[in-house]
UniProtKB/Swiss-Prot annotation:
The gene is SLC43A3. Belongs to the SLC43A transporter (TC 2.A.1.44) family. Keywords: Cell membrane, Glycoprotein, Lipid transport, Membrane, Phosphoprotein, Transmembrane, Transmembrane helix, Transport. The modification Phosphoserine is found at S253. PANTHER family: EQUILIBRATIVE NUCLEOBASE TRANSPORTER 1, SOLUTE CARRIER FAMILY 43 MEMBER 3-RELATED. This is Equilibrative nucleobase transporter 1. Pfam families: MFS_1. It is found in: Basolateral cell membrane. Sodium-independent purine-selective nucleobase transporter which mediates the equilibrative transport of extracellular purine nucleobases such as adenine, guanine and hypoxanthine. May regulate fatty acid (FA) transport in adipocytes, acting as a positive regulator of FA efflux and as a negative regulator of FA uptake.
Length: 489
């Protein structure tokens, strides 16, 4: 039965990867789309109003109001993609996969149709379309992440690969930009994306479960087209019993635990107010703010560094979008690192009698540290106003971002009880979304009082990035304390 279901599971894996790669995170290709919108004269009336109010406005800042409008749209959309993770996660938990995906398809298709029929006269509709596109995309990702549960020991690798595909999908807007330069209209491109909704519906009905894919995976588990061959009720009960047994083996110490060692998972609020969770929120929020501010203001930054030379701006915009595609290649390395270290530390725990769960949590510390280090390098390069250096900035940005979200999901999985994962994941994304709203006032500060000089803002954010190293340090110290003989005795 397992052999017959393997090709079906591989088909689910591959089509899920294509869905994340082609649709889920297209919002983060915003820079390419802004280039096209400017060519289409979106919000151009703001340039005329701004120039009229300033009287003697220079060519450098005469379109400041338009840049702020585009930045505001991206700020709202990026805020929505994180903040709505909490309610969309609840929808996924409560109403299961099929309902969540149908909602995603409705929002996504509505967004692409709105963009397709938007013009310079109705550009304000982007404030509605981009957040809908963001929420539909994140629901695609959330419903696909569970596919990792089908592949056991490769689970972390697949989860991080899907997060990398989510990042790489920003290259879709580069394709739209290149097609536009070859004469294909925005309307035609987004109508094509809208038609692809038929593919999403077909995949939802044929290749995805109606409910959730459990982890660990019970014996004789079937879904989608294979669900008609599902085992009878007795076998389902036996599979559920095996699932519970696997879960106990996954998280219990290699040593026999006495009743005193078996602890209740604790309430949701006890974990929410723990230092471990608080520092993780800081770690994610600071790094994510850097990425969102960079993506949302990149077009303006390139215009300033290139003295508003449209050809140079287009070249660097294309380079940035191309590097985003490689996120899907970078992210699995993070998952492989965590899977290998988890196996290594748990084997050591078996020999020494240490707590297995602490050993598993320890496996994410190198990934947390490496992500902070990559983000620091990205922040430093982004702060140096040298145009050719931005190629290095683009590379560091895509690598650090591809590590960021996979590491976030892995940490929450290992650091907190599984029954609270959905709520904690949604909460950490919602809190980081609130912090991400700072990108618009920071952009306004740079464009206004700082007169297009982001030096002081960049220095402040670089210093904040240094704070993210505290998180892996504290997690490592906690793991060492739990693995000590005094703790496990």
């Amino acid at each position: 039965m397992q052999g017959r279901s393997l090709p079906f599971r591989v088909a689910t894996l591959v089509t899920g990867l294509l869905e994340c790669l082609g649709f889920a995170g297209v919002l983060f290709g915003w820079t390419s789309l802004v280039f096209v919108f400017k060519k289409q004269h979106y919000f151009e009336e703001l340039c005329e109003l701004d120039a009229g109010s300033l009287g003697n406005a220079t060519g450098l800042d005469e379109c400041r109001a338009r840049d702020e409008r585009f930045s505001l749209i991206f700020t709202l959309a990026s805020f929505t993609i994180n903040f709505m993770t909490f309610p969309t996660g609840y929808i996924f938990d409560r109403f299961k996969t099929t309902v969540a995906r149908l909602i995603a398809i409705f929002l996504y298709t509505s967004a692409t149709l709105t963009i397709a029929f938007t013009s310079a006269d109705s550009a304000v509709l982007l404030f509605l379309a981009m957040p809908m596109l963001a929420v539909g995309g994140i629901l695609f990702l959330i419903t696909n992440l569970q596919i990792g549960n089908l592949f056991g020991k490769h689970r972390s690798t697949i989860i991080t690969m899907y997060n990398g595909a989510f990042d790489s999908s920003s290259a879709v807007f580069l394709i739209i930009k290149l097609l536009y330069e070859q004469g294909v209209t925005i309307k035609a491109s987004f109508l094509f994306i809208s038609v692809c909704s038929a593919w999403h519906v077909g995949r939802t009905l044929l290749l995805m479960p109606r409910g959730h894919i459990p982890y660990p995976l019970p014996a004789n588990y079937h879904y989608g087209l294979c669900s008609r061959d599902s085992p009878p009720e007795e076998d389902k009960k036996e599979a559920e019993s095996e699932k519970l047994e696997l879960q106990s083996k996954e998280f219990l110490s290699p040593k026999k635990e006495t009743p005193g060692q078996q602890q209740a998972p604790g309430s949701f609020w006890s974990h929410t107010f723990s230092p471990r969770f608080a520092w993780h929120v800081v770690w994610l929020s600071v790094i994510q703010l850097w990425h969102y501010l960079f993506i949302g203001t990149l077009n303006s930054l390139l215009n300033n560094l290139a003295s508003r030379d449209s050809a140079i701006v287009s070249t660097y915009t294309n380079a940035f979008a191309v590097t985003q595609f490689f996120g899907v290649l970078c992210a699995p390395w993070n998952g492989l690192l965590m899977d290998r270290l988890k196996h290594k530390y748990q084997e050591e725990a078996k020999r020494t009698g240490a707590v297995a769960k602490a050993a598993a949590l320890r496996s994410v510390v190198p990934s947390l540290t490496l992500t902070s280090l990559l983000s620091l390098g990205f922040a430093v390069c982004a702060s140096i106003p040298v145009l050719p250096l931005q190629y290095a900035t683009f590379i560091l940005q895509v690598v650090s971002r591809s590590f960021l979200y996979g590491c976030n999901a892995a940490f929450l999985t290992l650091a907190f009880p599984s029954e609270h994962f959905g709520k904690l994941f949604g909460l950490v994304m919602a809190l980081s979304a609130v912090v991400s709203l700072l990108q618009f006032p920071l952009f306004t500060l740079i464009k206004g009082p700082l007169q297009n000089d982001p030096l002081y803002v960049n220095l402040m954010l670089v210093l904040l990035t240094l704070l993210t190293f505290i998180h892996p340090f504290l997690v490592n110290r906690e793991c060492q304390r739990k693995e000590s003989p005094r703790e496990v005795a």
